[in-house]
């Protein structure tokens, strides 16, 4: 319980206003900021395994929805496991409408905060299930909801960058509509995933996987460091004929040969394709997050994929 006690103490300190405990990756994302629905069909999850990063837990839920059955969630944020189990217990315990009311910041209007967000009443409906699923996750959130106002928890432990309701639904197959949500509800008790807290760049990872999702890590590191990570994963963790989501890039509808010098390195596509030429075997333009919002089909976002032979 040593690591758990440390995580809870830090979370409580942040809620109390001791912001010196806030680290670079200490905030959770309530939902994915990627259009997972736009790229998940490029991967085979039918009874396959997945290693993924992502503090929102949505990579885990969408992969399980698509057939994955052996999932490892690897993330630098120590609260990631607790939040993933909170979502799973909510899916088991709450209706589609209740889930939306509990987790979404905006429901009816992007200018009016949802007053039921992190409702103690809705938490009480799911907390017995959470206790059964993962006792540490139950203790973590039960303590926080007992001590702090819901708005304090949401504003201080979670990133404030949450999109509109229609975008979140569009990015997640399991939230697309009530039928999809209920389909996941009917099978989610079978979900098992392993959580590992650590820095994927520096840590040794146990196991071999059919699929690996690196999410948007490519936007927060150098191309050379990303190349080293891909080499490590390819040699030690990726099965033959396995696939890696190397990176997710937003708003890539510009001419990739004409970019601004001050953009992040990975967006300089001629350089990226050269440095990662041994790994980028496919790239796909997909319906972007902004496209979902404006109901357009510009395919503004880009995914980079590696297929191992």
Identify the residue ranges that each predicted region occupies:
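A short glycine-rich, Lys/Arg-flanked "PGG" loop and its adjoining helix->strand segment in the class I
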Residues: 227-240
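A short SAM/SAH-binding and catalytic strip from SAM-dependent methyltransferases
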Residues: 210-224
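A short acidic, Gly/Pro-enriched loop at the edge of an enzyme's catalytic core
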Residues: 201-213
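Class I S-adenosyl-L-methionine-dependent methyltransferase module
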Residues: 2-11, 79-187
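S-adenosyl-L-methionine
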Residues: 2-46
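Conserved beta-strand signature within the Rossmann-like core of class I S-adenosyl-L-methionine
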Residues: 213, 240-253
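Class I S-adenosyl-L-methionine
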Residues: 256-309
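Conserved class I S-adenosyl-L-methionine
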Residues: 47-56, 71-72
């Amino acid at each position: 319980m040593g690591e758990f006690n440390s995580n809870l103490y830090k979370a409580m300190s942040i809620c109390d206003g001791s912001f010196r405990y806030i680290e670079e990756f200490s905030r959770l994302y309530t939902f994915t900021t990627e259009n997972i629905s736009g790229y998940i069909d490029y991967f085979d999850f039918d009874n396959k395994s997945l290693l993924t990063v992502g503090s929102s837990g949505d990579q885990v839920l969408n992969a399980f929805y698509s057939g994955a059955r052996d999932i490892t969630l690897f993330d630098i944020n120590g609260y990631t496991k607790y939040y993933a189990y909170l979502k799973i217990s909510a899916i088991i315990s709450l209706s589609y409408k209740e889930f939306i009311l509990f987790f979404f910041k905006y429901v009816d209007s992007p200018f009016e905060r949802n007053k039921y967000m992190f409702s103690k009443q809705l938490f009480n409906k799911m907390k017995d299930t959470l206790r059964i699923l993962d006792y540490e996750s139950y203790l973590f959130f039960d303590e926080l909801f007992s001590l702090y106002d819901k708005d304090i928890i949401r504003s201080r432990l979670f990133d404030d960058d949450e999109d509109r309701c229609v975008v979140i639904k569009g990015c997640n197959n399991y939230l697309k509509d009530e039928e999809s949500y209920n389909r996941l509800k009917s099978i989610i008790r079978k979900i098992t995933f392993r959580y590992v807290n650590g820095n994927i760049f520096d840590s040794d990872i146990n196991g071999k996987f059919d699929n690996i999702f690196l999410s948007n890590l490519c936007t927060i590191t150098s191309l050379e460091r990303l190349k080293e990570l891909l080499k490590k994963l390819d040699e030690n963790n990726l099965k033959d004929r396995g696939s890696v989501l190397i990176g997710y890039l937003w708003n890539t509808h510009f001419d990739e040969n004409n970019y601004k010098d001050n953009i992040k390195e990975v967006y300089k596509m001629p350089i990226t394709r050269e440095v990662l030429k041994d790994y980028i075997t496919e790239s796909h333009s997909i319906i972007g997050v902004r496209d979902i919002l404006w109901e357009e089909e510009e395919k503004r976002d880009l995914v980079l994929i590696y297929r191992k032979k």
